[in-house]
Amino acid sequence: MLSQNERKRIIALINREVVPAIGCTEPIAVALCTARAAELLGSRPEKVAVRLSANILKNAMGVGIPGTGMIGLPIAVALGALVGRSEYRLEVLRDVTPGAVEQGRRYIDEKRVCIDLKQGIAEKLYIEVEARGAGHCATAVIAGGHTSFVYLERDGEVTLDKRTASAAEEDGGEVPLTLHRVWEFATTAPLDELRFILETRRLNKAAAEQAFAGEFGHCLGRTLRCERERKIMGDSIFSRILSYTSAACDARMAGAMIPVMSNSGSGNQGIAAPLPVVVYAEQTAATEQQTIRALVLSHLTVIYIKQSLGRLSALCGCVVAATGSSCGITYLMGGDYGQVAAAVKNMIANLTGMICDGAKPSCSMKLTSGVSTAVISAMMAMDGHCVTPVEGIIEEDVDKCIRNLTAIGRDGMNETDRVVLGIMTHKC
């Protein structure tokens, strides 16, 4: 068993990475940075200039903004400036009202918001907001993490400058993980230390159930529950996993004012990691202990993979999140560490290379593909089948497999990222 100090550090890591969020985290992070700049300014900004990394721009172009019925960055920036509260972090737009949305529309129409691509930076998650008004100027910068402020300044007076610090230093030091360490923590830590993870079950299941009752995005979650689809897929554990996961994503990408529990700065990852585990646990009458440990295993696997992949990349986040849920489902099927490792290898062999072309309603389709693969990979692992080291990017050591996956997503797909962004920004 891990020492108490090691467990405390891992629990603190989970609590940093698994947090509530309303709306897609990229435009919400921009709204958060704008809100902080406006707070520093001390008055309503007359002009807001926003400069973003390409990945932030890509992920914020086509997604709904909570409570607005609108898509994209301008309304997120406007509302961040007018009603955002930075203390709410990824729920910064919690207080949005119809009146505030109307104010935001006017703010945009008055050409008070300017959004540009930040040139000459290596950081994939970078947000810089300059707010001007009443003869004053304030600047806020977020980098490395969706809520990680690294620079604050008003009228030349710098109150925070951590631009040279790493994200790990900002978060109090990175916790070194391996898949076996993730497994050991999830399966041996005292249960009372892990019960907090059940909040992800409550929040994300509620998001899916609200989506079933409404019209959100492409309505994939509801479609999978229709009579025609039931005739094809049946009313099974598998079909329920797909419908719950896609429904929660439908609502989130459409901009519903519905909170979800995010993972590593992504709400969709926070949906795809635990919800398949929750549904499988409920449908198989798993004990609370089994459910808790499976949820921790899923969430912490995602956090581990993201440590080397980075917050944003050209690789769709559902690849990572569904790998976590596959681990959790394998555990609930009675799998041991070897079978969980096999499920991870099966996932990497299958989904590596799925591109991220921004946050948008059709993300629910990708999440559904990811979690369907998660179930298949778990079933293969439990049946004794695992992709072998002679096949493609798979190696005997599961941690090396994970590093191969993250190297492809972090480094190998950079040109893919540039091409995708070029296509998205030059559409007629």
How would you label these PLM feature ranges?
Residues 1-11, 42-56, 236-255, 287-305, ...:
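Acidic-glycine-rich active-site phosphate/pyrophosphate-binding loop
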Residues 2, 6-41, 45:
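N-terminal signal-anchor module of multipass membrane proteins
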Residues 2, 22-25, 54-56, 144-147, ...:
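A structural signal for small-residue-enriched, beta-sheet-centric alpha/beta enzyme cores
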Residues 20-36, 258-275, 317-320:
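Conserved phosphate/anionic-ligand binding catalytic regions in large, soluble enzymes, centered on
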Residues 31-127:
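Early transmembrane hairpin of solute transport permeases
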Residues 38, 280-293, 303-369, 382-389:
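Hydrophobic alpha-helical bundle architecture
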Residues 44-48, 88-93, 114-116, 193-197, ...:
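Flexible, glycine/charged-enriched surface loops at secondary-structure junctions
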Residues 109-255, 422-428:
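Signature of multi-pass transmembrane helix bundles
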